[in-house]
């Protein structure tokens, strides 16, 4: 899913039910709206990663492989492919993966030159890379997924990400920031004020938002990354919906023996 699952506020059994409920909701979104959910314009997060890679490899002398975690129907994956990157798209939604494969085939048949390649997989990082022992990628990318992971699940996901990344690889993710809290639509989880919100709409029951901050991201990945830069951005939650306010983190996996990273404010121009 473009956005995945889970709340850290509740124990495992209810959390599993919420995960299944949200997965079903996104399956329905993809079945009902398909490519009309976001269109195919690349996200601000994808543009930031692309610019960083291209600036660091101006001659394009090496192949760049990117994991697109929560790839949805492939809108950012296709953007990366057109730039010459190779993509491993991963999503929990089988419907989304089917759509991504279909969009890729349509683009191949359109006559538009594709300098890169892609494969799309239903599952998670662990299941996909279990059969890719020793494989390392040059970049890990995730747009608007991490705010729906519990603290434990977020740590698991980032640990798996670091495992599949080579030293110096780019880590570029976005998630909803506290600026996105909307009193008309959301309410705070008791005891988790200013951290976790839930939607008031009963149709979105269990669809909780764990807002990310620089501090929360630093706690999770600060020991693994260097050259960390944060950027604020916004984009519609879906076509025709209000904007969501995002915090974007761009960093690079620290090599062995590197000193501790110093987080920086920054933004990267889009290509």
Regions found by a protein language model. Name each.
Residues 2-64, 72-132, 149, 156, ...:
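Class I (Rossmann-like) S-adenosyl-L-methionine-dependent methyltransferase catalytic domain
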Residues 64, 137-138:
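Conserved acidic residues
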Residues 68:
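Class I SAM-dependent methyltransferase core
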Residues 141:
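A conserved beta-strand element that flanks and buttresses the S-adenosyl-L-methionine
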Residues 144-148:
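Short catalytic micro-motifs in class I SAM-dependent methyltransferases
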Residues 155-167:
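A short glycine-rich, Lys/Arg-flanked "PGG" loop and its adjoining helix->strand segment in the class I
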């Amino acid at each position: 899913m473009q956005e995945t699952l889970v709340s850290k506020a509740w124990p495992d059994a209810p959390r599993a039910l919420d995960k299944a409920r949200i997965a079903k909701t996104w399956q329905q979104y993809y079945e009902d709206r398909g490519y009309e959910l976001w269109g195919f314009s690349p996200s601000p997060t994808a543009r930031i990663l692309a610019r960083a890679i291209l600036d660091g490899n101006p001659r394009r002398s090496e192949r760049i492989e990117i994991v697109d975690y929560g790839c949805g129907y492939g809108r950012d994956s296709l953007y990366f492919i057109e730039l010459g990157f190779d993509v491993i798209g991963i999503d929990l939604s089988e419907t989304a993966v089917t759509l991504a494969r279909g969009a890729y085939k349509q683009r191949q048949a359109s006559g538009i030159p594709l300098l890169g390649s892609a494969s799309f997989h239903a599952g998670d990082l662990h299941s996909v890379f279990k059969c890719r022992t020793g494989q390392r990628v040059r970049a890990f990318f995730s747009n608007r997924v991490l705010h729906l992971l519990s603290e434990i699940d977020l740590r698991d996901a980032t640990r798996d990400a670091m495992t599949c990344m080579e030293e110096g690889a780019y880590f570029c993710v976005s998630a909803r920031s506290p600026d996105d809290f909307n009193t008309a639509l959301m309410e705070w989880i008791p005891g988790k004020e200013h951290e976790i919100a839930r939607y008031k709409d009963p149709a979105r029951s269990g669809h909780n938002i764990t807002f990310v901050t620089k501090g929360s991201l630093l706690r999770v990945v600060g020991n693994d990354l260097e050259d960390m830069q944060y950027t604020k951005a916004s984009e519609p939650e879906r076509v025709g919906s209000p904007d969501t306010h995002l915090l974007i983190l761009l960093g690079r996996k620290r090599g062995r023996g590197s000193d501790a990273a110093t987080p920086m404010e920054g933004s990267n121009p889009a290509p």
